[in-house]
Amino acid sequence: MMSTRWDERHGRILGDICSRFNEIGIRYFIIRNFEGLPNNNPSKDVDIMVDTKHTKEAKAILLSIYRAHGISNYYEARHGFVHCCHGVDVDNNFAIKIDLIFSYISKGFEIFTFDELYEHSENYNEFRVLNNYFEGVMVFIYKQFNYSPRLKDEYKEIIYNTHKSYPGFSNLLRDLVGDYLAEDILASIESRRFDDMLLLSNKLTKALRKFAFAKRPLKTISLVAAFYITKGSKVIFRYKKYSKSFSVIAPDGSGKTTFLEKLLEEIDFFFVNDKSDNRCHVYHFRPNLLPNLGAIGENVGIKEQDKNFTNPHRSKPAGGLSSFVRISYYWLDYVLGYNLYVRQDVQFDRFSVFDRYSYDLIADPARTRLDLPLWVRKLFVKLMPHPKVVFYLDADPAVVFGRKQELQLDEIARQQIVYRALAETHDRFFSLDANRPAEKSANEALQVILDKFTKRL
């Protein structure tokens, strides 16, 4: 169920979008991985570069086609001029991702305009696509320019074959970065010394920035300023609006691990991610910006860290003062770590996933050796950041005890009373029946996530 990435339904949607572009005269072309389209696609998505003058029309067409094909939920992630358009149809286990690219601009620097790129496009089946020569040019530039370079083997082959097959590549590179740097880069490509080529990426970036600025100085200044203002606004000032955070809470043995595995698998499928994309950042209990207190004690020679994690209540509660220091330490980690790491997750369009959360300080203080009044623990938790969604896995105490005997039956029952009370305090909490198979709970949780983080079409 979770394996299909592109089939005939995807092809019909893509075909209808491009046909509509052609009907009303919107110029576009597909970038890379077009072989086999419309019904076969070696990639998980499709990148379409669209004439910048038709941004609104192109987006409206895509949304109308999604609706016409039964897409129920829509999610969009924007990275500069790249609009990643996700469509989801949960009832039919279907997901599609089409990236509409309205300018190929990296951190404000534009090397090629749309018109310049369009000159290197050609027809393929019923689509307009970027030709093989400029596909190689774009792979060479944009897998290095302005970012830490990483080259898959397939990209190395594309770059090498472009160099060998198209004499214009060498001349273009000289025009972009100058003769001396071009010769060093070309020599590395010729001998397949790609590690050496990547060592020149910083020089390449500087040369390309200089080229872009000389080509259109005022526009480049404007685009660079807009890039950093937009990024700063999103990540620093408005990260809460864009964050996709949720946590899972329950007594040990309730099936959190299995539930999360199933849920993250579904998120990856319906948001068209590969595991290597790392679109789900999983935290355990807290952000862990600050180290474990046990590790600090071991490092300063106070005592050896206790790593027997099979018994969560293995240690005696700390004294009153020590407990206050502990909960203050956790509060600081949540405040600093959440604000830092979730901002980073927003920057890279990741889900922030917490396996357990600060609510454990209320329901299970023995785990963290706290001996403080309930009202104190509640106050500290209230003053911490909170995820947008909290899933509470509610199961019969006997079922929980049968799965894992780390806690006594009466302790499981006690914790569940507290968790249930917590789940009634705010609409961020969603109680799920954990007596049933994890797949069913994950399906229900997925619908909550879609309702929270996507739009209905």
Where are these regions (language model features)?
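Conserved NTP-donor binding/palm subdomain of two-metal-ion nucleotidyltransferases/polymerases, i.e.
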Residues: M2-V46, V50-K244
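NTP-dependent small-molecule kinase module
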Residues: N202-L218, A398-L457
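A glycine- and Lys/Arg-enriched "phosphate-lid" helix/loop adjacent to the NTP-binding pocket
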Residues: R356-A421, F430, A434-N435
